[in-house]
Amino acid sequence: MPAAVATGVQFGGPPKNKKIVFDDSGEAVVKQNKKEHPQRPKFEGKEQVKKPQKIKFGEDGKAKGAKSFNKNHQKPDFANKPQRIKFGDDGEQVASKSFNQNHKNGPKPQKIKFGEDREAVHQKPFNKNNHKHNGQKSDFANKPQKIKFTDDGEDEVTANSSNTKTEPTKKSQKIKFGDDGESKENFKKPQRIKFDEDGAGKNVSDSDGDSDEELGDSISKKHNKYQSKIDEDEESQKKWYHVHPDYPSTDEVLDMKENDQLELYNLCKNSFEAEKITFNKRNPSDARWLQTALHKGTAKDRANAGALLVTSNPLGNLEALSTLIGFCKISNKASNDVIAVLTDLWQEVLLPPNRKLLAVHTRGADWKKLKKDENLRNEQKRRIYAYWHFESELKDQYHEFLKNVMQGLQTGQEHNKNSSIVSAARLLAYAPEKEQLLLTMLVNKLGDPIAKIASKALHHLSEVAQKHPNMCGVIVAEAEKLLFRNNISERAQHFALCFLSSIAPSGRPEVCTKLVNICFALFKVLVQKGAVNNRTMQAILRCLQKAIVEAKPAKDSNGELLTKEMQDTIYRLVHLADIRVAVQTLGLLLQLVAVKTEKSDRFYNALYVKLLDLNLINVGSKTAAHLLHIVHRAIHIDNHVARAQAFVKRLLQLTLYAPPHIAAGCLIVIHKLLRMRRELIGGTGASEEVEEGSKVVLPISADLDKFGSDDEEVYEDVKDEADDTKDSNPLEEKADNDVKSSASSWHHARVAATEAKVRDIDSCKYDPYHRVPAFAGAAYALRHELLLLRQHYHPTVQVFAEQILQQSRIDYYGDPLRDFGLPHFLERFAFKNPKKLEASQAAENATVAHKRYMAHGARGRPVKSLTKANCTEDEMFIFNFLEHKRRQAEIVAQNKKQKEIKKDAAEEGDDGEAGEEYLKEGEVDDDEFEAYLDGYFGKKFKEGVDEEQDEEELNFLQELGGEIKKDKSKDKKKKKQSDKAEDEMDDIDDDWGDDDLAEDEDDEIEGEDQSDDETGSIDLQPLDDDDDDDDDDDDEGSISEGGPGDSDSSDAPESPDEEDDDDEDAPPRSKKSRKDSTDMVGGRSFAKTLKQSHDMSSLFAAADDFSSLLEETAKVKGQGTSNAVFNKDKSSDKQLKWEENRRSNSKSYKGKKFAGKPAAKGGRPQKAGKKRKH
């Protein structure tokens, strides 16, 4: 049987023809490519196929004239388009015409049909209604057909498959072969081909029910697999607590039986183990390396590696999280770093911010709902159970982490406590999980013995309360437990109260009411103990001031926060307690008057009396600022004009004797009050309404002449009324006066009712000692204090007083208590540039900004930049001082230059006239004054100063004696050398002569601060001399301390034994003090003083002391020499040399030993050149 050749062409890809040759038995033979078998002949008896040939079948079914393709399967050049085979009615191949793309000429191409004998059989053409080409290519032309072969090489099934995509509007047809080898035409629906396990094809009909079910199952499995993959991708992108937001479904906790809890726990655990493989697939590519780094390397690297693992895949790395928590123990040196890393991990990855973590046994309601939900697949339910198990394990791990943090807080060092406090505060502010445990930890740290730790806990607790105002009630309840513990310390109570006062403004009314009750309870406890002058009382009053604004009174208190007994106690504190406590109490009373509309008379009377307290001049700037704020606010809200004028008068009186900064503050307060309340200006400015309330009725008409003309009309009515009721009953007159007089609670100036003449207090004149400001009569007094303040010694006070008198505006916006205080004034002489605030510091709250206050304007500029134009009145003193120093420096420089000119002129013979002319111009010809200037300005000006030197380059520190420190160091060096030289000398006379203890001649500034004793005077009886200056008593070492057995320790020692006893019992003193004491009582110091002193006045002052020395040494042999002064015990020169050699050979010998210094271990202090008595 002739072989049939079929050609399959693949479109849409590279042009490649595949050739299949069938032998006589009908089997297909695969020919090798020519390129793979180059040894075969090129044509091998057949012609080269240049163009695919059509197969023609005869009547016997055999193909005629079939030419084979190229054996090497090489792509022919003309094989770009496949050729179709056309058969006639008799089954023979008909000569085919050229293929028309539009299919308009000739019938459509036919498909090849094979019979049972594997021979091609005639096939009818396609029906036009079934398949329309519309001038396009057929489906099987667009997509080539593949023929699959079984193991025996026979072609069994042909299915349409292609590696390339066809056009979307075309669909290829599948060919189905039956048992007879014929293909059944079915153009409406493509046929399915199913393959067995051995690869053989099996015919499947569409009507087979089993195949439809299997198809549905396979489709559903593929869909479920695809959906699961999508779900996994979505879960990996979300945080774990956002994957199933429906659970927990309710806040209700359903009680479960023990069996149900165990069943649910096992179910969740098994589900988690089943899903663990899926969870592990989410690990990053370097997960294995991170696992290695978690157990090897430094502590910080291990912590970071574990954090990366947990961050990338929390559900698959619970073991890594457990390992990290183990690193947080206090025994680990790097626990602080691990705690910080884990805190970030809990905050950013693991903890849900809006709910608590749930354990498995609390999932009863969710489990019940999940079992009833039929929309979820079993796989989804299993995953939900796995998440429940993970959350339960995470809750346990978090509790273990907090245990380690608590251990660091309780038993750790300071750095451990700091890191633990920061971690606990961050977690408490972020999530509600374990908030009670975290809050207890932080509140307990308020009682830490280290003040820094307690302050840090207070700060972080305040931040938590500000972020979560709703937590204030819980925080206050926990702080209350701390305050009322039995073993609580005063420091812990102070920090707890400071914390409560910081959160009081942000609390709600019920929280403020609770704070008020706590403070009042603690207030009673402290009053009973008598501890009212401490910091705790101040903290209580400060907390009450802030909390009482929003507090609500109790239902059974008649609308009052304070009981009568409590009010009396508080007012007693104003008069009896310390000035700081009294000021805090006044602030509390002002809050009650301003906010709760309490009776104001008693408060104003207490404040008015407190302004006379002499302790106000010694208070700090903080207390003074608080007091001025209270006074300003009290006067501002007071509607009683006469009372307000009395307070203004009292403030002016305080200004006269107060320090400059408090005086300036009082004047600023008065200035603001007078500008806001114009009726307070002048001696009388009371309004008619207020005067009627404060008016006092005088029954005696003779006293009415004391009133001024301004109030004549008002008091004429009083006069008429008094005349009408002159002869009336005194009791009735008293009743009328009660109605018209002031209702002040402290105004009790009434005579007895039986007295005929009833007279009230005369308020027509000013009474500075009146206890009630409303009746002090300040409206009738002139404010002559302002005239005195114009002559105040502080220039700023003068300016402020002048501006108040002229009713002009005071343009000052700084803090007078800081700018005009003594510390600021002295700091300006230090010539330091002011500190510059950073941007972060400038943006802080008002409390911190007040502590870092810097002066504004000219007061905040460097001293060198001051000019006469921008200098303020209080800085003018410094400016003039510097200008004076500059002028002196210029005079010294000019004088030095002129000296050189004078010297040159003297050499030329013009000596006299030039010198006289210079002296007349410079007006400085005193050599002593020049030496004084040289010594004052230091060595810089001794050598001369360049006249053209810029003023900005002047070193003011050197001008003020900056070389003193260098001179002192040189003096010390000289003294050490002299001490060493003295040790090597054998004779006292040589010792005196060879000693070079010359001091610097320019040390005059240092000498000004020294007493007479330090400049060379010998004071043998410093305590008995009543005429000594106070500075002598303050100098170190000026008082010699005697032993306990001495009757008079101030007397000078009369013998070496007494001196030794005194020195032995005296406490150890510094080198300077020992040196001073030696210089005062030792004869050697007198010799040094004689040699180094340049001030002869000090020598005359010590003449009496020197004469007493001569009298004491009158009986000594060899008198008239210096040895008689230094050798009072009459020791020989041999004895002195032996003692000196003995001391020099001892181990503890460090040079020349003077009086008061120990000679050796356990020995008594020895005097140089003195013999011990045996």
Curated annotation (Swiss-Prot):
Residues 207-216, 715-724, 907-916, 945-954, 981-1038, 1048-1065 have a biased composition (Acidic residues). Disruption phenotype: Larval lethal between first and second instar with reduced larval size. Conditional RNAi-mediated knock-down in proliferating cells of the eye and antenna imaginal discs is viable but results in small eye size and disorganized ommatidia, possibly due to excessive apoptosis. Conditional RNAi-mediated knock-down in cells of the prothoracic gland impedes pupation, probably due to reduced ecdysone hormone levels. Conditional RNAi-mediated knock-down in fat body cells delays larval development, induces dyslipidemia, and is lethal between late third instar and pupal stages. Residues 95-104 have a biased composition (Polar residues). This is Nucleolar complex protein 1. One of its GO terms (cellular component) is nucleolus. Signal peptide: none annotated. It comes from Drosophila melanogaster (Fruit fly). One of its GO terms (biological process) is rRNA processing. Residues 33-63, 113-122, 176-200, 725-739, 897-906, 1127-1143 have a biased composition (Basic and acidic residues). Its main location: nucleus. Residues 1-20, 29-237, 715-742, 893-922, 944-1085, 1116-1174 are annotated as: Disordered. Pfam families: CBF. Belongs to the CBF/MAK21 family.
